[in-house]
Design a protein with these regions (language model features):
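Catalytic domains that recognize anionic headgroups
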Residues: 1-468
């Protein structure tokens, strides 16, 4: 093998495995056909922070305190003003491991949870916080308004809540509920516009520009580990329906087929756009020589639900729409694909990607595999919701606002720990005593509608033992 192989990971945030069956994504489908395609990899967590932390450290989500704690009621988890440190400074990450063997490590992230300030970039020599720069560029006015709260920290947020609560005591219950919903809808509309609901691009162009800048100015032609996060597939979407997850999850709005289909169509539009941006990034890396001797990995951190099991989006129970993600590995020599055309449909633990990349970088293997296919059991862990930032306000309002009460209850009910355990085609949903466990035969029941645990008790006991 000619020197150390470059390793490039393009992580397509929020892309579920089944999206690979859609039309209009020629680049992704061609790469899957010509490389090694793991059609049903299993995300270790149900939202960005736990999945990335697990992937970077080769640990299960529940073994990482910074991402498995209860975030319900923690204002610092708000995506617009994240102040959490998800990893402690002593963690050994895949980036730090590769740095020690001579790799130049670079993170380009368009995700607010994956930045230089959250410690998920631990070990990377170069970090480009694309999300921050992209959102300030598009939303200078909003950034200035939010800076008052950001700089004031939690005390500023609590003062704002307290002032709001005192004002609401003067209103009759009916008027308070109307006012809460009116303000919530206006806030959601504002955030939706700020996040680029009507734009297909949510920062992919800026991420690719940052990649070009890095390769032109800092690329040292030594072995490279480049990790990019694209967030185009994340809500909010170009769709003419309400986008507030918790209005649907609480039953205030009906998540009917029309709404679910409109949101899903917007989701697929973004993925089709992202397909073109992936092509652009690959062309950039070919021109710079990064793909002269490299493995390109394309995957996701979690999927997205659109009405299945009456759920919307992610950071929820690890049903298939959330837990299953695509994983594609393609080897390049002299800028051209070494066609392998291998497909693997069994469950693959995404946190084991850490070891597989390490094997690849150290020369122990020449293709991505490592521990990926060898696991008897694979798990995906939901340790609670990520949207807990408004718990204080909801708790204050719920005695006098029926809508706030319903949203609070919906968040509370989904803030329970659930672990999915895979063994071949069988999947166990373990609820830790909150309710009866469920087991599904995914070969015959891919929609997870028929609980077969009562006729598979012996296997269920073995699988439940894997849910720590």
């Amino acid at each position: 093998m000619q020197g150390k192989r470059n390793v490039v990971v393009l992580l397509l945030d929020t892309v579920r495995a089944s999206a690979m069956r859609e039309s209009g994504i020629p680049v992704l489908r061609s790469l899957a056909k010509r490389g090694t395609y793991y059609s049903a990899a299993v995300a270790p967590g149900t939202w960005t922070a736990p999945s990335h932390a697990s992937l970077f450290t080769n640990k299960r989500v529940t073994e990482i305190p910074g991402v498995s704690k209860d975030f319900f009621g923690r204002e610092e988890i708000d995506p617009w003003m994240v102040k959490n440190r998800f990893l402690n400074g002593g963690e050994t990450t895949i980036a730090s491991r590769l740095s020690r063997i001579g790799y130049q490590t670079t993170l380009l992230s368009n995700n607010p949870f994956l930045t230089s300030t959250t410690n998920l970039g631990l070990g990377f020599e170069n970090i480009y916080d694309v999300w921050k720069e992209s959102n300030i560029k598009y939303n200078k006015g909003l950034a200035e308004k939010l800076s008052v709260i950001i700089n004031g920290g939690q005390s500023a947020r609590h003062k704002m809540y307290l002032a709001s609560y005192v004002c609401t005591r003067l209103l009759p219950k009916g008027a308070l509920d109307w006012l809460y919903m009116e303000l919530r809808n206006r806030l959601n509309e504002g955030v939706s516009k700020a996040e680029g609901r009507n734009r297909l691009d949510k920062g992919a162009s800026d991420a690719n520009a940052a990649l070009r800048k890095y390769l032109e100015q800092r690329y040292n032609y030594g072995p490279q580990f480049i990790f990019m996060n694209y967030i185009e597939a994340h809500e909010n979407y170009p769709a003419r329906v309400a986008q507030d997850k918790w209005l649907y999850m609480s039953g205030i709005l009906d998540l009917d087929e029309r709404a679910a289909r409109a949101l899903y169509n917007g989701y697929i539009k973004r993925i089709r756009y992202l397909d073109r941006k992936i092509s652009e990034a690959i062309t950039t890396m070919k021109k710079s020589g990064v793909l002269d001797n490299a493995t390109l990995i394309i995957t996701s951190d979690h999927g997205q639900m659109f009405g299945e099991h009456h759920m919307l989006y992610h950071s929820l129970q690890p049903y298939e729409g959330i837990a299953r993600v695509p994983l594609i590995a393609v080897n390049y020599t002299n800028g051209k694909i070494d066609s392998e055309s291998e497909r693997f449909d069994g469950p693959v633990p995404m946190n084991k990607l850490h070891g597989a990349i390490s094997d690849l970088a150290s020369g122990r293997t020449e293709a991505l595999d490592g521990q990926l296919k060898g696991a008897r059991y694979t798990v995906s862990e939901h340790t609670g919701i990520s949207e807990g930032w408004d718990e204080t306000l909801l708790r204050m309002l719920k005695p006098r606002s029926k809508s706030a009460a319903r949203i609070y209850e919906a968040k509370h009910m989904n803030n329970k720990r659930v672990t999915a355990v895979y063994c071949g085609n069988m999947k166990l949903m373990h609820y830790f005593g909150e309710r009866k466990d469920s087991m599904y035969d995914l070969d015959n029941d891919p929609e997870e509608e028929h609980n077969v645990i009562d006729v598979n008790r012996a296997l269920a006991i073995k699988m439940a033992a894997q849910a720590k």
